[in-house]
């Protein structure tokens, strides 16, 4: 079992998860409950995050719609947006009642919409506010409370800004810090540009870990492959992939062979040589047939409850990159899933296009 690292700033409380942790980053409009259900079929050990949900929305809105999730999604963390300690604490308490495994505070999103609410990355300029929110949430819940931040914003010196924030949230009792290892520019860059243009500084995050050996520190930003993720955990306690894991979701099937289960500490799953592609995609067609059947059943249930097939299948389009039949798979999901009355048969047809192409390829070899 991997070592479980406890935060010395909060003695007696539950420690954070078993390291090293592999996580899929919170992504607005992407990591909704349908994506997380799908991702969990691909990896049992990945820590999954919700898209950011504003604390005020939880207090005033439809909590079941905002917070409800399938039990199979565990381990699953809720990312909260906000800056009011009282509201953040109450939202965290409600989320704990729903069964989430972690509450994560967003101190990294630079979008105009998030800035207009004075939360997200702009809170890098208000470490005292972040610390107050962390302390209030820690007092309200028993599950881990964590922070996801940038290394700084605008003209801040990252060497100072990151250390200042981390020192204050450690004092407040945070269980972990996840760092997107680049600055955010609050004006002049779009959210997409803020993920690509500011230079990465992994070295600063490594130094932060050396200075805080008992604090769980994970890294995010610029990571595209499982190999790159494995390199990061030579230095840190966790690694978080975002869009790469979403657009090439089959890579999640290899994660369990390298990372323990965050909650149980179950060891990485032994994987036979030759059962994965160079991209880290599992080749076992029986496994993929099970994914097909489970997702078709899930989609049928969603449709029965008034939803549309596209709500589910939009998260599945990136599967099978580089495989025979992948183009036809994408065509089916992109076109047929949007038609009126589309049902789970579309998922069967898309997967079967890959299976048939793979069988033809193998027969020709």
Question: What residue spans do the PLM features occupy?
Answer:
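Conserved beta-strand positions in the central sheet of alpha/beta enzyme cores
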Residues: 23, 48-49, 77-79, 104-106, ...
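Alpha/beta catalytic cores of nucleotide-metabolism and tRNA/nucleoside-modifying enzymes
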Residues: 1-18, 22-23, 28, 135, ...
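Short secondary-structure transition/capping segments
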Residues: 59-63, 115-118, 158-159, 189-192, ...
């Amino acid at each position: 079992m991997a070592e479980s690292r406890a935060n010395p700033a909060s003695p007696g409380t539950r420690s954070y998860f078993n390291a090293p942790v592999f996580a899929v980053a919170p992504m607005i409009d992407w990591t909704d409950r349908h994506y997380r259900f799908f991702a969990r079929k691909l990896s049992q050990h990945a820590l999954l995050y919700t898209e950011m949900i504003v604390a005020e929305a939880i207090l005033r809105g439809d909590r079941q719609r905002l917070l409800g999730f399938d039990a199979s999604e565990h381990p699953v963390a809720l990312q909260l947006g906000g800056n009011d300690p009282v509201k953040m604490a109450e939202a965290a308490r409600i989320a704990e009642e729903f069964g989430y495994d972690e509450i994560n505070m967003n101190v990294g999103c630079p979008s105009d919409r998030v800035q207009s609410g004075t939360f997200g990355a702009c809170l890098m300029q208000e470490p005292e506010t972040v610390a107050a929110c962390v302390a209030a949430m820690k007092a309200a819940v028993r599950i881990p409370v964590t922070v996801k931040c940038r290394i700084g914003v605008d003209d801040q010196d990252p060497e100072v800004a990151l250390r200042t924030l981390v020192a204050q949230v450690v004092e407040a009792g945070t269980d972990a810090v996840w760092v997107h290892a680049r600055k955010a520019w609050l004006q002049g860059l779009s959210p997409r540009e803020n993920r690509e243009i500011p230079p990465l500084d992994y070295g600063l995050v490594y130094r932060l870990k050396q200075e805080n050996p008992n604090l769980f520190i994970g890294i995010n930003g610029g990571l595209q492959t499982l190999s790159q993720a494995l390199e990061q955990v030579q230095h840190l306690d966790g690694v978080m992939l975002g869009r790469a894991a979403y657009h090439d979701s089959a890579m999640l099937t290899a994660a369990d062979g390298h990372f323990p289960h965050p909650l149980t500490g179950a060891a990485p799953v032994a994987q036979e040589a030759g059962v994965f592609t160079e991209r880290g995609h599992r080749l076992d067609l029986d496994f993929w047939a099970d994914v097909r059947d489970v997702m078709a059943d899930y989609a049928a249930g969603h449709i029965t409850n008034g939803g549309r097939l596209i709500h589910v299948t939009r998260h599945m389009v990136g599967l099978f990159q580089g495989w025979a039949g992948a183009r036809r798979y994408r065509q089916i999901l992109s076109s047929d899933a949007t038609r009126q009355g589309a049902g789970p048969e579309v998922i069967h047809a898309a997967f079967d296009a890959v299976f048939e192409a793979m069988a033809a390829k193998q027969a020709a070899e």
